[in-house]
C-alpha cells in the first residue's frame, strides 16, 4: 500500500499481479493462465512457490517467479518442476540461465547491472505450447564485463602494467 504502482494508471494491455499471495489471470485468446505475486516488503524469506499448483491444466500455465536466494523467496526447483507449469519465468538473478528439463529460466538482465555481472547478457526467446517448450538465449548487451587474469611482478612499473592491460583489453575486443 502507498506504492507508486498503486497510484499509477496502467495501460489497458498491462495486467498487474499486485497481491502478496500468488494469484492468476487467464488470457483466453492465448489459452494461457499466468500466475505471480508482488513483493510488499523488501525481503521475503518464505518459500512462496513451494506449494503452488496450476488450477487450469487445460491451458498453458506460466508462473512469473521473482526470487531464488535465502532473502528473496527461496526456490526449490524440484518442487516447482512438479507443480504442473508449462514454463516458469524467473527473475532476480542477473545471470541468464535456461533449464529446459525443469521448464524454467532466469532471464537475467539485458545489460550488465554492475561489474559483478560477468559474461553475456541478453534475453530469452521462447515458444510455449501444451506439446512442449523451446527456449533460446539471445545475446543483446552492448557491453560485457569479463574477468582478465593478470600477473603483476614486483619489478613492473605502472606504465608497463598499463600498457599490458590495454593490450589485453584490445585482444578481447575493445568495443565491449
Regions found by a protein language model. Give the residues of each.
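Binuclear metal-dependent phosphoesterase catalytic core
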Residues: 21-30, 107-171
Amino acid at each position: 500500500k502507498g506504492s507508486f504502482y498503486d497510484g499509477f494508471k496502467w495501460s489497458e494491455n498491462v495486467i498487474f499481479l499486485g497481491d502478496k499471495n500468488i494469484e492468476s489471470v487467464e488470457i483466453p485468446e492465448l489459452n494461457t493462465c499466468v500466475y505471480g505475486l508482488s513483493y510488499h516488503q523488501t525481503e521475503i524469506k518464505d518459500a512462496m512457490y513451494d506449494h503452488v499448483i496450476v488450477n487450469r491444466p487445460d491451458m498453458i500455465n506460466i508462473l512469473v517467479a521473482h526470487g531464488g536466494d535465502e532473502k528473496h523467496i527461496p526456490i526449490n526447483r524440484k518442487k516447482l518442476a512438479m507443480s504442473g507449469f508449462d514454463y516458469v519465468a524467473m527473475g532476480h538473478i542477473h545471470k541468464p540461465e535456461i533449464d529446459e528439463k525443469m521448464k524454467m529460466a532466469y532471464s537475467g538482465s539485458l545489460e550488465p547491472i554492475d561489474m559483478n555481472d560477468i559474461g553475456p547478457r541478453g534475453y530469452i526467446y521462447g515458444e510455449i505450447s501444451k506439446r512442449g517448450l523451446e527456449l533460446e538465449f539471445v545475446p543483446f548487451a552492448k557491453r560485457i564485463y569479463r574477468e582478465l587474469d593478470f600477473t603483476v611482478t614486483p619489478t613492473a612499473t605502472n606504465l608497463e602494467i598499463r600498457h599490458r592491460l590495454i593490450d589485453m583489453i584490445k585482444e578481447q575486443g575493445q568495443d565491449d
